[in-house]
């Protein structure tokens, strides 16, 4: 088998009927005047920002933020200049208590995590403006489940952070004998107090990586 890259996986999937159908639906919606997030050039940013062999940590989100210009292809992240969404505020709150010296940044762009080896994957990669989960059933999860399966099969000793019920449904794809899985509630204001705040997933991730003789993640942004 040739060296596995995201380009190879995408080139295989893009020719399959389900994948073509996703973009047929997106193009139809755009023609009808609907606004789709993220911008088309940003949909696959998670694959551009973190090479397959560089991944150490996988954080699984649900679908992109559906507000104006919030989504840019990385789960939980927003571009510079966009106000922090509530879930991201809670992520920073947990980091402040979990990681000594962490200073809450004034922006919500998590791209530097991507460069550290943190794969910020939404299971649904697009959304209609103002309509959460509007693209939940157009086929994206067939693709992102394949991505998770590929990581599970061809990598080992990854840390999977599964926050909330939706992410936790992906645990059946992940072999917990090969990988380290950490589970807690979603960081949204509705559920953060039921486990996320105080979970210490960031320090636990680094402890695991250090025990595997891997470089730890610099969570400071």
From Swiss-Prot:
It comes from the Bacteria. InterPro entries: UDG_fam1, Ura-DNA_Glyclase_AS, Uracil-DNA_glycosylase-like, Uracil-DNA_glycosylase-like_sf. The active site is at 63 (proton acceptor). Pfam families: UDG. Its EC number is 3.2.2.27. Gene3D superfamilies: Uracil-DNA glycosylase-like domain (3.40.470.10). GO terms for cellular component: cytoplasm. It is found in: Cytoplasm. NCBIfam families: PRK05254.1-1, PRK05254.1-2, PRK05254.1-4, PRK05254.1-5, ung. Excises uracil residues from the DNA which can arise as a result of misincorporation of dUMP residues by DNA polymerase or due to deamination of cytosine. This is Uracil-DNA glycosylase. The lineage of its organism: Bacteria, Pseudomonadati, Pseudomonadota, Gammaproteobacteria, Enterobacterales.
